[in-house]
């Protein structure tokens, strides 16, 4: 009988210990989990802008003069910038944070110079990724910049 009473008093002094341990571990687990979610979002965004650059370069290889909607006859959706911006599903990558440039091998913007079939054309995208988790304080303003580029040879000069 004495052992039973001792056991109860021993357990009584540790009452709530598991709740405190769970609260401490849950806090650390949530911080790590939010960091992993940010990493996943960043990886998805990086893959999405790589796909967007590839889509833009493919369209630029077929229609090298249609860089953006300002060119006559190249209104949306028939231009490189529109194709690159709309490659990713809606809402997952912010189109407003994409900076898209189209350039030819000689560094020009491919608009005024003579375009030659077989000449490389490059689409470069710089994307501003906003981190949301607790590790966002580790980078300036909580923003990372992802850069992707794709190169295709001009297939048809129209």
Residue ranges and their predicted role:
Residues 2, 130-158:
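Low-complexity, S/T/G/P-rich flexible repeat/linker segments used as non-globular hinges
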Residues 23, 116-118, 141:
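Transmembrane beta-barrel outer-membrane domains
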Residues 1-2, 7, 36, 89, ...:
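Generic N-terminal initiation segments characterized by hydrophobic and/or small/turn-forming residues
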Residues 45-46, 84-91, 134-138:
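Intrinsically disordered, low-complexity boundary segments flanking structured domains
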Residues 14, 116-118, 145:
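A generic fold-level signal
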Residues 2-84:
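Alpha-helical assembly-interface signal, strongest on the long, hydrophobic N-terminal helix that forms
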Residues 51, 55-126, 156-158:
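Short amphipathic secondary-structure patches
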């Amino acid at each position: 009988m004495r052992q039973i009473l001792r056991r109860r008093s021993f357990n009584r002094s540790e009452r709530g210990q598991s709740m405190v341990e769970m609260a401490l571990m849950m806090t650390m687990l949530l911080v790590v989990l939010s960091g992993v979610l940010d990493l996943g979002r960043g990886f998805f965004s990086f893959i999405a802008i790589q796909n967007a650059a590839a889509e833009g370069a493919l369209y630029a290889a077929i229609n090298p003069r249609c860089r953006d909607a300002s060119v006559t006859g190249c209104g949306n959706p028939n231009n490189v910038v529109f194709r690159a911006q709309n490659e990713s599903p809606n809402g997952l990558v912010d189109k407003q944070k994409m900076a898209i440039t189209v350039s030819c091998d000689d560094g020009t913007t491919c608009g005024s110079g003579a375009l030659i079939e077989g000449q490389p054309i490059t689409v470069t995208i710089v994307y501003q990724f906003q981190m949301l988790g607790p590790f966002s304080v580790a980078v300036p303003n909580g923003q990372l910049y992802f850069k992707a580029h794709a190169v295709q040879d001009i297939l048809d000069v129209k």
